[in-house]
Amino acid sequence: MPASFDTETLTGLVLAHLNADPASLHFAPISTGKHNTSYRVDSNQGRFVLRIAPPDEAGFLFYERHMMRQEPALHALIRAQTTIPVAEVVGHDFSRTRVERDYLLMTALPGTPLSDFPGLTRAQLRRALRQVGELLRQLHALTAVEHLGEEAYGYLGAHRPMEPQPTWAAAFRIMWNMLLDDVVACGCYAPGEAQRMRDLLDRHLGHFDRPVVSRLLHMDVWSQNVLIDAAGNVTGLVDFDRALWGDVEIEFAVLDYCGISEAPFWEGYGAERDESPPALLRRQFYLLYEVQKYMPIRVWRRNDPRSAARYKQQSLALAAGLL
């Protein structure tokens, strides 16, 4: 569960970056956050969101440690190069001098999370999904060559959980193995079970070794991270902290899992999906990458080994289809 902070601490964090009247500050917890501790901040300077990262001893996947540190640069890039509605980061501090956590302060976006919208109609949902497709098409137009200066792949933000790789196949192999290390560390896979998963990817790695443009991927687009207005128009995309640079197919697999990639999404995205046998095989691996992460999450952050066991069974069933 996210922690809570007293008003004095929150006020100090905000005033370090915002010239606001302290008496005008009002804080309200944001309940949809599952990882960070977040607050809506009302002030005489406007409305903001304060996000405070978990403590270092919290259970992290390999790419989650310090992942907030990549958000300021990503938000600046997306705001400059696209029309995607993302918040402006007005301040951040990763020095741990004010609080023993990373934190950032950003402008508040209008709208309600799609997951929380009361009485959502089919028309509103179709409009929202179509617009998500349009917005992700813009995001995916941002390439590593143009914006990072090299065709590199992987988690390339300031948190640097891995070294940049020259090919997508090399990057995904590292990501796969590091995630399996986490699944072993949380006790859900025995080393032998993890080795079989490692060998499974290696047997099929040739299907990943192909020309792939390294594109910016959100990797966490689900209903809680899409804000909409009363008509179903998208007013914000949030939580870019899990972003990576690589093959758009892995983004599509996450969208499948999160229920976003319905027909209206593809209408908005404006491109056909590769349905070739190699693409379908890669899709299964990308789905496995998404599903397996929930084992350490359920053990380390939810203390729910029973749920983790269900994700293990789902993962083993998916892997059996790749043998």
Question: What would you call each of these model-derived segments?
Answer:
Residues 1-25:
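Juxta-kinase regulatory segment immediately upstream of eukaryotic protein kinase catalytic domains
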Residues 16, 186-196, 202-203, 207, ...:
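A conserved long alpha-helix in the C-terminal portion of kinase-like catalytic domains
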Residues 28-173, 178:
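ATP-binding pocket architecture of kinase catalytic cores
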Residues 31-41, 49-50, 89, 139-141, ...:
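Active-site acidic catalytic loop and adjacent metal/ATP-binding pocket
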Residues 51-59, 111, 243, 247, ...:
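Short glycine/proline- and charge-enriched loop/turn segments
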Residues 117-122, 157-215:
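ATP-dependent phospho-/nucleotidyl transfer catalytic cores
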Residues 168-172, 181, 214-216, 222-281, ...:
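Active-site Asp-x-Gly
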